[in-house]
Each structure stands twice: as structure tokens, then as C-alpha cells.
Amino acid sequence: MTEYKLVVVGAGGVGKSALTIQLIQNHFVDEYDPTIEDSYRKQVVIDGETCLLDILDTAGQEEYSAMRDQYMRTGEGFLCVFAINNTKSFEDIHHYREQIKRVKDSEDVPMVLVGNKYDLPTRTVDTKQAQDLARSYGIPFIETSAKTRQGVDDAFYTLVREIRKHKEKMSKEGKKKKKKSKTKCILM
């Protein structure tokens, strides 16, 4: 069974824990209790393949930013979460993405942009803004509501699909490099 290491990042209060707990335990946590770091595991079937999701729910608060490099190193894919009623959390996505790319030392890291709190009427981040940002990053965008469960499975499953595509691409590039290195050298 394939295991996928998923990391949920974003500013404090955007609903990272609520999304994760909704996926794992099928219930909505409405009281806010800032996370330092929580880890969850769940076996799921995605596109006919049984897999184990190892999900790291991270601290959004700035005082825990020193811990970020460590968990970003081990993550294979990242859910970059903002709240649709919090423009600052949307603007912060750029910083999380840059930090992930720096720590992973790669421009090509599996990510999904997630606009959470879709159930709230007080929207300040337009869907089109988020779609445009995701398009500029070359990553999928999904709107979710941890409260109603809308888009929750889709967000995590899409990230697994992005990781699979990334692994396939890396494996093809590895094979191309091996083929190139098999050229013969003739000495005269």
C-alpha cells in the first residue's frame, strides 16, 4: 500500500485542523484551538488504489514558523489553505509557497490551493482571484467547507493525484537520463 505524506499549511484560523478532522473523523470542530502540530493517518481508496494518507496539520501562527522547514522537508505534497473571508490569509499563500519551494529546493512541488469556509456569506476573496493565482502557480484550486464537508475529500484526493503525477514525471525523467548515459565511447 502506497503511503502519501501530505502537509496542510496556511495562516492561523483558516480551518486547517477543521478540514483535516472532517476528512479523518467525519465531523466539524467549531471551536478554535490553535494547533502546534498534529499528525493523522487514514486509509482511503483513490482511483481504485488503496493508500495510506499521513497528514500533518501544522501551526499557522507565526511563532511556530521555525518548525516549518522541518515538516516541509518530509512532505510530498502540500494543501495551501486560505479562508475565503480573510484576504490576508490569501495573500500569505505566496509566502508559504515560496518557503516550500526553498526548503524542497524545487520549483515543481505537488500543491493544491484550497479556499476554505465556502459556507460563509462574508466572502472577501473572489473565486476568480483564487483561480487566477492557482493557474499562475500551475496547481489545482478547490473551494471547501469543513463545516458542510463540501470539497474536503476532493482537496485531499486531488493532492494525492498531483503527487502521483509528479512521481510519474520524475520517474520518466530518470529513465531519460539513464538512456542518455548509455552512449558508447569508442577509443581509437
Curated annotation (Swiss-Prot):
Listed GO CC annotations: cytoplasm; cytoplasmic side of plasma membrane
SUPFAM superfamilies assigned: P-loop containing nucleoside triphosphate hydrolases
Alphabetically ordered keywords of this record: Cell membrane, Cytoplasm, GTP-binding, Hydrolase, Lipoprotein, Membrane, Methylation, Nucleotide-binding, Prenylation
Topology in membrane: Lipid-anchor
Record organism: Kryptolebias marmoratus
Catalytic activity annotation: GTP + H2O = GDP + phosphate + H(+)
Listed name of the protein: GTPase KRas
Activity regulation comment: Alternates between an inactive form bound to GDP and an active form bound to GTP. Activated by a guanine nucleotide-exchange factor (GEF) and inactivated by a GTPase-activating protein (GAP).
Lipid attachment, kind S-farnesyl cysteine: C185
